[in-house]
Amino acid sequence: MTQTLSLRAVLCATTLVSPFLAQAATESEVEALKKELLELRQRYEAQQNALMVLEQRVRQVEAQPQAPQPQRLVKSIQPPAQARNDANAVAGTYGASLKDDGAPAPSVENIYQDASGFFGGGTFSLETGLTYSHYDTRQLFLNGFLALDSIFLGNIGVDQIDADIWTLDLTGRYNWNQRWQVDINAPVVYRESTYQSAGAGGSTSQITEKSVTGDPRLGDVSFGVAYKFLDESESTPDAVVSLRVKAPTGKDPYGIKLKQVPGNNNLNVPDDLPTGNGVWSITPGISLVKTVDPAVLFGSLSYTYNFEESFDDINPQQGVKTGGKVKLGNWFQLGVGVAFALNEKMSMSFSFSELISQKSKVKQDGQSWQTVSGSDANAGYFGLGMTYAVSNRFSIVPSLSIGITPDAPDFTFGVKFPYYF
């Protein structure tokens, strides 16, 4: 009888405790799922920010003018008698060919045209250019912590982005009185970017790759005005000041949505590629050119100010639309170089240029300004340029720019065809 009562008591106790144990297990599972969801959300937001920073760097670097390619300015304006005296005083030197009142050789005419951006070969000139840039970057995302010399606890993803950019430029220039010049530049941009990620399913050996292309579209159109305020002499260089305004006519990068690639929750790619910065900018600059027989030295300095702009949507998350403001970082750019005339038709140049950019800021509606980490840049380039004068009116100008800092494109190759009317 006693044993029967004890058995009944145990059964009753078990029946009463079981619901509480099941409820405790359910609450534990819910907390674990919430924790996992929070980690996934933080990882997704980190990748969104990383992609935005990389996209801003690509657009920021590709939007900059290439390293100056030396070609010919206009001849310094002097009275004929003074020009003849100068020529007699320095007869037989390379500098004399720039001072001579007679027409210089085509290669001398092409020596530093792009160095100052001032074209004096005719009243009107039209230039067509084609440029190809390649840019790649690798960024490591760690979710967890590093222990015991490279043993990773948590998820790991290695993301690499390869960007190929083709730009077709059409530039028209009008030179007035050998002192003033106005120009307009309209680019058409084609882009293709390939995104790679390792770490799918927690494995570092599985790599997912996804390519995104953007159809050829209009980029940011720019307008410029230049004034030649100083003529070259024995002690002074040719000097030109310029002012350029860029309009946001291209596809801006803000509000482009990210989508997850099937089979790899580490990889999110944009559904479109921009062709412009999306903001107005203004760039004052100065260029100097000086003959130092037998070479020509040139240099330039400019500063770009980006205006603050408002957008209806700056959120990259699918199904979410958030308005806000964007303030791209301003930047300085400087360049120096040397050029030589090889013969009457051909010249060659070597140059270095650097772009230093401040950090960008974003502000969602109802929130405060936030600095975008990693959006500053220091892009350095080494440039090789050549000019070949087909005739007095038509030239071919190929150039190669090699990136020497991580923020610069790996390389940029371009060729321009200026024609003078």
From Swiss-Prot:
Any single Gene Ontology cellular-component annotation: cell surface
Subcellular location(s) of the protein: Secreted; Cell surface; Cell outer membrane
InterPro entries: FApF
GO BP terms, alphabetized: amyloid fibril formation; protein transport
Keywords: Cell outer membrane, Coiled coil, Membrane, Protein transport, Secreted, Signal, Transport
Main subcellular location: secreted
Keyword flag Signal: yes
Consequences of knocking out this gene: Deletion of the entire fapA-fapF six-gene locus shows no visible growth phenotype.
Pfam family, one: Phenol_MetA_deg
Coiled-coil zones: 23-64
Signal peptide location: 1-24
Role summary: Transports fibril components across the outer membrane. Upon overexpression of the endogenous six-gene locus (fapA-fapF), cells form large clumps during liquid growth, make large amounts of biofilm and produce amyloid fibrils.
Family, similarity comment: Belongs to the amyloid transporter (TC 9.B.153) family.
Name of this chain's protein: Functional amyloid transporter FapF
Gene: fapF
